[in-house]
Each structure stands twice: as structure tokens, then as C-alpha cells.
């Protein structure tokens, strides 16, 4: 079972910060948003897979696992996945969850979701991801948000986060 936070999230030192390679930016936190995980699991997106498999311990919202599991179910029902491919995707999702730091959807996150974001409109579930990243308590410069969603990408950049 993945670790769940009770309140404020851990600092960079406790979630796997690494010394930067020469000429690279320091990334203390890598937040994996649902679209990137789904892209890695179902589309085998090489860039998403690389980001998700980074040596930096990934952080994500508890919401991510519900969204990814639903995407797997939808793909199977639409016959875009064989039963074997569905089982493989579910196993990969479970492996990812075991190595993640999972952030609960707290009252603070939900309160933030109610306020405007820099680039509107933002869908509610996307706002939950953005608010979760903000709740980590790290400087935006120390957080990279891994996403395949344009609205999340645009807002993350506007909020000062690095984006992959």
C-alpha cells in the first residue's frame, strides 16, 4: 500500500532529492499528474515513461490512481486493450503506486481548488492536481510537474513550476 500523507507533505530531503548533474536544474520533487501516468501505461509514451521511472521518488495525488484505473477500464471496454494488456497495465499501476509518495486530497487542497488559477478555464480534477502540487510546501522552482494535459501544463508554468 502506498504511503498517504496526513497533512503537509514531506520536504525535498525526505522524498528523494538528488544532487543535480552538471548543468542541470535542481529538481527536488517530481509530481506525476494523471495524464502522464495514463500515457505511460496505455500509450507507452517514451518521455512519460522516462519521467515516471526517474530516480527521484515520484509524488502524486490519490486522485491519480482513480483516474488511471478508470482509464484502463475505459480502454478495455472500448476494446483498445486485450485482457492481457489490461492485466499488464493494472500490474504496472500497482507497481507505480508502491513506489510513490501519495498525497491525500485534503480540505486545504479542496479550498484551493475553489479559487481561480492563472489560466482559466481549468477542469475540476486538473485543479485538484495543481492544488496538490501547491500543497507540497516546496518552492515552485523545486517541483517538476509531469503532465500530458495542456491546461495543467499552462497553469503549472504560470505558477512557476517546471513541466515535463
Model-derived features: positions:
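Short, well-structured N-terminal submotif of metal-dependent ribonuclease cores
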Residues: 1-67, 75-87
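Anionic, Ser/Thr-rich low-complexity intrinsically disordered regions
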Residues: 50, 58-60, 73-77, 83-103, ...
Amino acid at each position: 500500500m502506498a504511503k498517504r500523507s496526513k497533512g503537509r507533505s514531506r520536504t525535498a530531503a525526505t522524498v528523494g532529492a538528488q544532487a543535480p548533474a552538471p548543468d542541470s536544474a535542481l529538481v527536488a520533487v517530481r509530481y506525476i499528474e494523471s495524464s502522464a501516468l495514463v500515457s505511460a501505461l496505455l500509450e507507452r509514451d517514451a518521455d512519460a515513461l522516462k519521467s515516471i521511472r526517474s530516480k527521484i521518488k515520484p509524488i502524486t495525488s490519490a486522485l491519480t490512481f482513480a483516474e488511471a484505473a478508470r482509464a484502463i477500464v475505459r480502454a478495455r471496454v472500448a476494446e483498445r486493450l486485450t485482457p492481457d494488456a489490461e492485466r499488464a497495465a493494472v500490474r504496472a499501476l500497482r507497481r507505480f503506486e508502491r513506489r510513490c509518495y501519495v498525497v491525500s486530497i485534503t480540505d486545504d487542497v479542496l479550498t484551493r481548488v475553489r479559487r481561480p488559477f492563472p489560466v482559466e478555464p481549468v477542469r475540476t480534477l486538473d485543479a485538484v492536481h495543481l492544488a496538490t502540487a501547491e500543497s507540497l510546501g516546496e518552492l515552485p522552482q523545486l517541483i517538476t510537474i509531469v503532465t500530458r494535459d495542456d491546461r495543467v501544463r499552462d497553469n503549472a508554468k504560470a505558477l512557476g513550476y517546471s513541466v515535463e
